[in-house]
Amino acid sequence: MMSKPCATSNLAITHLAAASSDNNSFYTAHVDNKLARILIIDLHTYNTTANNFTTEFPRPVQTHEFVLPKGCKTGTVARLIANGSDALTGITFDGKSYAYELDMGKGVKMANVTQGECVSVDRKGGFKVDVPWSSAAIVSLKC
């Protein structure tokens, strides 16, 4: 989220305070004054050690809608997700686990996790992304 494509690029990170709440936080990354990424963090607790890793209901998902500047056509979603909000194992980013015991910390593709998800921007510049409770999504945009 915080990286820039080359040393001479100008990177600006913005917290979207007006859109954020107690349970969601939103950030944008602009590279050379162009929107490059949107970060969505869901802060709800789910399946935590406080309730012995048992939540009585399926993991809720929130849909977030965005309207992009002209020229943005598509994007890809990379997700940070685990079985619960305070999990120490089973954590993946964009479908890969970086657990040391799998390949000494190198990314290993997990068969049961989505990778390289695409979003389509409609003709009005809008798109939606679903974010499960206690997870994060980075939408990298083609603008």
List where the protein language model places each region.
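Catalytic cores of secreted or luminal carbohydrate-active enzymes
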Residues: 1-22
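Carbohydrate-binding surface patches
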Residues: 20-71, 79-84, 137
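Short Pro-Gly-centered flexible turn/kink motifs
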Residues: 130-141
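Acidic, Ser/Thr/Pro-rich beta/coil linker or hinge segments at domain junctions
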Residues: 53-131
